[in-house]
Regions:
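Glycine-rich beta-strand-centered segment in the early N-terminal region that forms part
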Residues: 34-51, 61-104
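NAD(P)H cofactor-binding loop motif with strongest signal on the N-terminal glycine-rich segment
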Residues: 167-168, 235
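Helix-to-beta-strand junctions that scaffold the AdoMet/dcAdoMet cofactor pocket
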Residues: 247-248
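C-terminal capping/lid region of NAD(P)-dependent oxidoreductase domains
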Residues: 2-9, 307-316, 327-347
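C-terminal substrate-binding/catalytic core of Rossmann-like NAD(P)-dependent dehydrogenases/reductases
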Residues: 267-318
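Adenosine-nucleotide cofactor-binding segment
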Residues: 181-240
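N-terminal Rossmann NAD(P)H-binding glycine-rich loop of SDR-like oxidoreductase domains
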Residues: 169, 173, 177
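NAD(P)H dinucleotide-binding glycine-rich loop of Rossmann-like/cofactor-binding domains
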Residues: 100-167
């Protein structure tokens, strides 16, 4: 459908009404929905590009529920502000922005999306929409994990401290490596295939080790019996025991993947070590008083990108935003072997 064929009150979108395996053509469908109107703190954004993340496949995963109207997924976008709410102060129509959005509101796989200005920032000037869309969710996750949950300093005060990153080649790991390098941290990053090892090294990993082999022996060969902090962007359960073994006394572990079985926190007691979750949707989901922290975070990162200190983690653009391309993106994510980020751009 051409834009001129559309009623100005409607928009193109990709959604779901049933939760189905990704190979089912009905798992994600092209649809026409009412165009939303911004609330007081909202921006109405014309979406130009989106990225996909594991949260998309988790939300879409098969279950018995049925949606009366199509549910729109997608939590990574870049686009142009079309209209603003009555209390918006940070943006104006025409601004080019990037954001991840809120897990409890309609997502970015639509031609227009309403998003709270407090979790949005101007996109990097040096990136096009596709390059920018690859970054928001993973950047917020990595920044909050390293510099808020683990308490490391973003600007070098902790230079030389050791950080183990489990899952270095994925979307979050790819930006975490860059942030840690900039902070002067000594990173030990896990990867396994030649292409993922090279990717991690190119992003600035100090050391790369094989997650298919025992981690303690590989760390010891590099001169590390323990590490000051651990960021696990892969499987929390699978690495729990070894993380508890490798963390230094009074160190901290951060994870982002929900556990499948109870975690034995007692393994950390003698070391007075801490464990903390990172979920980048927390601020928007609960409307925390510091929601605007994500606006500031993305604003700062945009400056770092434009200064050449960080680079996009875009790996491949799969084509325009439609159901067929999004199903392919979900299919690739579910394989669990991706490098960097997948993006869709244009309608």
């Amino acid at each position: 459908m051409k834009p001129s064929d559309q009623d100005s009150r409607t928009m193109r979108a990709v959604g779901l009404t049933r939760y189905l395996p990704v190979d089912d053509p009905q798992s994600l469908i092209d649809c026409t929905l009412p165009r939303p109107g911004p609330g007081p703190h909202d921006l109405l954004v014309r979406v130009a590009a989106v990225s996909v993340n594991p949260v998309d496949t988790k939300v879409r995963a098969p279950k018995a529920a049925v949606e009366a109207t199509p549910r729109v997924l997608g939590w990574d976008a870049a686009g142009t502000v079309e209209a603003i709410g009555s209390e918006v102060t940070l943006f104006r129509p025409g601004d080019e922005v990037w954001y991840a959005g809120s897990i409890v509101r309609p997502g970015s796989n639509a031609e227009f999306q309403c998003v709270d200005e407090r979790i949005v920032a101007l996109k990097p000037r040096s990136l096009d929409f596709a390059q920018a869309a690859a970054l928001p969710l993973t950047t917020i996750t990595a920044w909050e994990a390293l510099f808020e949950r683990l308490g490391l300093d973003a600007d070098g005060a902790d230079a030389g401290r050791s950080l183990l990153i489990i899952g270095g080649a994925g979307g979050v790991g790819s930006i975490a490596i860059q942030l840690a390098r900039r902070a002067g941290l000594t990173t030990i990053v896990t990867a396994s295939r030649p292409e993922t090892i090279e990717w991690c090294r190119a992003l600035g990993a100090t050391h790369v080790i094989d997650h298919r082999q025992p981690l303690p022996a590989q760390l010891e060969a590099l001169g590390f019996r323990q590490v000051d902090a651990i960021a696990n962007f892969a499987d929390t359960d699978a690495y729990w025991a070894v993380m508890c073994e490798l963390i230094a006394p009074q160190g901290r572990i951060c994870a982002i993947v929900e556990n499948r079985a109870p975690l034995e926190l007692g393994l950390l007691k003698a070391k007075s070590a801490g464990f903390v979750w990172e979920f980048m949707f927390t601020r928007a989901q609960f409307g925390t008083p510091d929601m605007i922290a994500q606006h500031r975070l993305l604003t700062r990162v945009a400056g770092l990108v434009d200064a050449g200190e960080l680079r996009t983690t875009l790996r491949e653009t799969l084509g325009r935003i439609d159901a067929a391309n999004l199903r392919e993106a979900h299919r690739r994510l579910e394989r669990g072997t991706g490098i960097g980020k997948l993006v869709l751009a244009g309608w």
